[in-house]
């Protein structure tokens, strides 16, 4: 707040935009989907796209999306039924469906993409499930809303549908005669 206020005070007509790269929500129900699926007899590998070494923010590498690589394609239908039966899973998409819907590289996202239910996340846990009040994460359908604060915006609120619209509008404004 102090730095934005100072910037505004020193440049009162300046357009200032503050946004984020994604939304964030509390997730109280975490599932180690790989452990649950393996206990049910499925041979698979689960990859959370959020996975990184910065564990201060994601202690359990938790996120709202999971790429699933099945080792036995003959069990596809059985796997889909199993995944859909888990309360933490809201959607089960084939790689082709996920690639088309979310502009993902189909060859790199496994056989299936799982999307978490509200308040849930896929996580790397020592057990199968964990209820916690300490997890805030992103990567599900419920973090698509991104905050935008604008001081002297170049256009009205309806013009800013995507974060990329900020740059497009400012560049357009600069190049207009």
Feature locations, PLM:
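Feature captures the catalytic ectodomains and active-site-proximal regions of enzymes
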Residues: 1-177
């Amino acid at each position: 707040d102090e730095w934005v206020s100072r910037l505004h005070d020193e440049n009162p007509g300046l357009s200032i935009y503050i946004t984020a790269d994604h939304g964030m929500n509390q997730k109280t129900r975490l599932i180690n989907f790989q452990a649950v699926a393996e206990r049910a007899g499925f041979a698979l590998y689960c990859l959370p796209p959020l996975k990184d070494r910065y564990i201060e923010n994601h202690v359990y590498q938790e996120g709202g999306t999971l790429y699933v690589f099945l080792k036995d394609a003959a069990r596809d239908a059985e796997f889909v039924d199993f995944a859909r039966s888990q309360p933490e899973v809201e959607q089960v998409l084939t790689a082709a469906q996920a690639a088309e819907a979310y502009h993902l590289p189909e060859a790199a996202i496994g056989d299936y993409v799982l999307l978490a239910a509200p308040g849930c996340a896929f996580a790397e846990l020592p057990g199968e499930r964990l209820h916690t009040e300490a997890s805030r994460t992103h990567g599900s359908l419920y973090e698509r809303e991104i905050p935008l604060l604008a001081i002297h915006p170049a256009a009205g609120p309806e013009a800013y549908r995507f974060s990329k619209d900020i740059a497009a509008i400012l560049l357009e404004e600069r190049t207009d005669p």
